[in-house]
Amino acid sequence: MSKRTLEGTTRKQKRTSGFRARMRSVNGRKVIKARRKRGRYRLSV
């Protein structure tokens, strides 16, 4: 048996697509705004 290849890291995930990371840039804010408008239950990771 070979091991699974893609095993994600929570820290990396939070740093790239977490709420604080999104709020840091203008485009990230746009993402949050769009997700709010659409009524998403989860705005970010």
Curated annotation (Swiss-Prot):
**Which family is it part of?**
Belongs to the bacterial ribosomal protein bL34 family.
Do you know which Gene3D superfamilies this protein is assigned to? 1.10.287.3980
Concerning Pfam families, the annotation shows: Ribosomal_L34
Query: What superkingdom does the record give?
Result: Bacteria
Question: Is the keyword Ribosomal protein assigned to this protein?
Answer: yes
Key word Coiled coil present: no
Record protein name field: Large ribosomal subunit protein bL34
Annotated GO biological process: translation
**Keyword terms:** Ribonucleoprotein, Ribosomal protein
One GO term of the cellular component aspect? ribosome
Task: Supply the source organism's classification.
Answer: Bacteria, Bacillati, Cyanobacteriota, Cyanophyceae, Oscillatoriophycideae
> What GO molecular function annotations does the UniProt record carry, in alphabetical order?
structural constituent of ribosome
